[in-house]
């Protein structure tokens, strides 16, 4: 039986990583013949079949037009918006290619005009299709925005006609029939939000956590024992981690909140060089960090999971100051490496970090509370922090390990296929 996993990207961003992990799980099950289809190509049996340059360039030109239109939206410009008024011809073609009655289409993050709302409506309306739709953000039940503004109820009540583009996109989504689609979300927070939403409140929704490879993301004792020497910092240095695909550019990742909190913490410390801020996810160091006065190390863009695991093992604590996370991939990977996490007590991160067990959760989005939690970790002994890390790994293995997630995923695939298709 074929399982076709659809995603805008094969590798860039947390949603692509989650989709690729689903491919990894499906590939290990001999019942399924799986592949991952993206704008840039198809990954099948470990081989990448690239889309033509013309196909990619044509798609990017459509993306550009769509993106230009988003500048007329009345939303907060800090929140990503997508219209999905165009399709990737490559994705549509390969999604239908070789399809059989037993094929399952697993749609992941398909914004950036991977599949248009018009094509999604046709696909979802077809009762012969077997579809799993995984939400990686709030776009499917909002209008154009990927996350509803904090305390906004538009996704529940609808959008004002004065906001023409958002109103138009939301009305297009209202015409989509989700009855034939099984929807999954990675966290309880996203489940509750989707169930409250005007568009998905009557839909069939299940929690399918993101899979964490706990064989790769694990404690590396040799790396941890030599971390200060590897980084060239004092043996008593306290190493704080922060990472995001776009570095500090994306305001949803909360880098500004972390900087303000660190400024408060460092103002009470004489030897600021003992504090190390290690960043990753962008090649350039954010200029705002230079004013902190502490030791800054930027690891750049990390595309290899093994290298990422090493970085988590360098840290005393990983800080995830995001204003919103549908899941919290970085937090889960860090805990799997036995590195505790500080975050805000909000959104999907609450499924991952347990306050005073595997990390500390600050009051949303209080700089003072975040600073207090950083200071609390700094004042702990290494042994006390290690207990947090051990608890975190236990939780990740139990909730997001291969055995648990694959069981849920395979049951959903078989459920979508229908009892009559069971072999």
Predicted regions located by residue number:
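Conserved donor-binding/catalytic core segment of Leloir-type glycosyltransferases
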Residues: 184, 234-253, 259-262
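A short helix/loop element that forms part of the nucleotide-sugar donor recognition site in Leloir-type
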Residues: 218-233
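Aromatic "clamp/platform" in nucleotide-sugar-dependent glycosyltransferases that forms part
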Residues: 323
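A charged, aromatic-enriched C-terminal amphipathic alpha-helix characteristic of glycosyltransferases
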Residues: 386-414
